[in-house]
Amino acid sequence: MNMGIDFPKKLTAAYNAVCKPLCRELNIPQTAFDILMFLANNPDYSTAGDIVNVRKIKANLVSVNVEKLAKDGYIERTNIEGDRRKRRLSLTEKAQPIVGRGKQLQQSFFDMLFENTTDEMKKNFTETIGIIDRNLDEMLKG
């Protein structure tokens, strides 16, 4: 397996496959679900541009889905003081049941990823990711 290409593709495909039944049940497109969950899980990133740049969803898909989510009452858009071009996206009460189900699904997905591993293996994995994260920070400094 090519860790640089195959693993991320497989991880994304598995996540989407796990999400598909819930998205069907809720009658919500995967991209709209991803946007809601991104906003719920990342409160420091609250604009459409953040979703494009951080979550790597194409701008046109973000635009169309944000418009529909706002129209359907799942998100609200408010102006950001000092920047007329940006609008803060926030989840409404109507979105909370979807977010709750989504968080359960994400935890279940995470648990499935670590099936057949020991607590020590999980701990080592987490520590290794932390080290890699710090190494990346150092690379980006210089």
Show the residue positions of the predicted features:
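Charged, amphipathic alpha-helical coiled-coil/dimerization segments
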Residues: 68-127
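C-terminal regulatory/oligomerization modules of transcriptional regulators
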Residues: 1, 119-142
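N-terminal helix-turn-helix DNA-binding core of bacterial DNA-binding proteins
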Residues: 17-61
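Alpha-helical linker/hinge and terminal dimerization helices associated
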Residues: 11, 15-18, 98-117, 132-140
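Hydrophobic structural patches
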Residues: 8, 36-39, 129
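Short amphipathic alpha-helix starts
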Residues: 10-14, 60, 89-92
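N-terminal leader segment of winged-helix/HTH proteins
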Residues: 1-26, 72
